[in-house]
Amino acid sequence: QAGCEKSDIDAVAVTYAPGLIGAVLVGLSFAKSVAFALGVPLIPVHHIRGHIAANYLAFPELEPPFLALAISGGNTMIVDVRDYTDMEILGATRDDAAGECFDKAARVLGLPYPGGAPMDALARQSPGGVYTLPHAHVDGAELDMSFSGLKTAVVNLAHHAQQVGE
């Protein structure tokens, strides 16, 4: 599909972390096999660093240093990007990622997957201040976050609203 030959491949890059262990192991095993079969180097890539680095392609004017907020269904991190390959995670979710919170909330509200954009559209229609929800801040952790309480609160609110016919 890519229109290239095996001889065009100079190396194989693969995510080694973070991620669901089963998916990471399958990806690593496949990538190692391909690299070995082709006789090319295997390049391990940190999943979140890859997301951040992809922005250099999309925004060529982007130059370190800067702070990056990396949010997905499985990870939420605040990253200090000092140089193109020098990055430090300053804070991360302690449990559920922000994206997982959005996806689960969207599902219980009958919204499509992934839930980020539909939840954003729904929130923009709200007058605000209707519900008191927990914050993602973790006591004693300057930049770490926790989204499990928020996710549970939204799910409980949605179930309660369904029970009372709201």
Predicted regions and their residues:
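A short helix-loop
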Residues: 70-71, 78-166
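Short coil/turn connectors at secondary-structure junctions
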Residues: 7-10, 38-41, 61-67, 74-76, ...
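Short, acidic/small-residue loops that bind anionic groups at enzyme active sites
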Residues: 31-51, 91-95
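Short beta-strand segments
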Residues: 13-15, 46, 67-72, 79-80
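Conserved phosphate-binding catalytic cores of ATP/NTP-utilizing and phosphoryl-transfer enzymes
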Residues: 45-67
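Short Gly/Thr/Asp-enriched flexible loops that form oxyanion-binding sites at enzyme active sites
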Residues: 14-38
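Phosphate/pyrophosphate-binding loops at sites that engage ATP/ADP/AMP, CoA/4′-phosphopantetheine
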Residues: 1-10, 162-163
